[in-house]
Amino acid sequence: SLPPEIAYMLQYTGASVVLAEDQEQVDKLYEIRSEIPHVRYVIYEDEKGMRGYKDPWLLSFAEVLERGREHRRKHPDAVERLLLEASPEEVCHLSSTSGTTGRPKAAMLRHRNLIHMGVALQEVDPLLPTDDYLSFLPLAWIGEQMMSVAMALTGGFAVNFPEEVETALQDLKEIGPHVMFSPPRVWEGIQSQVWVRISESPRFNRFVYERLLKVGYRAAEYRMRGRPMPLGLRLAYWLADQVLFKPLRDQLGFLRLRRAYTGGAALGPDV
């Protein structure tokens, strides 16, 4: 985001603490510091390039953790006391709109809202405590809050995070999640990668892929309509799965995937 956009959101929300990823984001906040006098602290995560910054306004994430540990030693019951004092009606998340038709606005979500959302989703499509979920989207997006916070609290599954943004695809293969949630552009990007690899493969491989893909589409139609597949199609799909779909899922990290959610925009029928 540009500094004026950041200034607007901080003024709009009245935030007193800001979490910045790295030096680049910290510098943006310095540009608008005079416009955000209510911000008491800026907490930065990546310490690269921050050695020369000597300002009590700034705190490294490591410093925050150490302060928390020290506070815990002095006040061992502080967290439990705060939990008992908390109310389901308290605001826990400000969800920003996209701002495509004007300046962004913030929807005020309470603890009750998020937990109810998680419970409702569990009733419709239950997830298991033994499931692994891969979280690689911004937590500022309400869709990721829904999965990584609300659904994780109500379903009890493990939330995994990539080591770095650049290693997300490799981490996906290593984790092999049971559940994923992504906007259409992510699924479309994965589909494009598959298409590129197929288009660069030998002609015979492309022929096999196209033939077996048709079998997969036919099987998917029966599954989506909840109808049993004819015997011939079941056999053809089993063969297609062994030859193409299962190895492909393994390469993508989808071998254990049971739930692939999407939201935020329309998903193309081909995907």
Regions found by a protein language model. Name each.
Residues 1-31, 117-134, 165-179, 251-253:
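Conserved ATP-dependent adenylate/AMP-binding module captured primarily in the ANL superfamily
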Residues 1-67:
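Structural core segment of the AMP-binding/adenylate-forming
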Residues 6, 90-121, 129-136, 145, ...:
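Extended, hydrophobic alpha-helical segments in both membrane/secreted and soluble proteins
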Residues 21-22, 46, 90, 183, ...:
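Helix N-cap/beta->alpha junction signal
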Residues 58-59, 63, 69-96, 103, ...:
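Conserved pre-ATP/AMP-binding loop-to-beta segment of ANL
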Residues 115-132, 139-242, 256:
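Conserved AMP-binding/adenylation subdomain of ANL enzymes
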Residues 137-141, 264-266:
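Conserved AMP-binding
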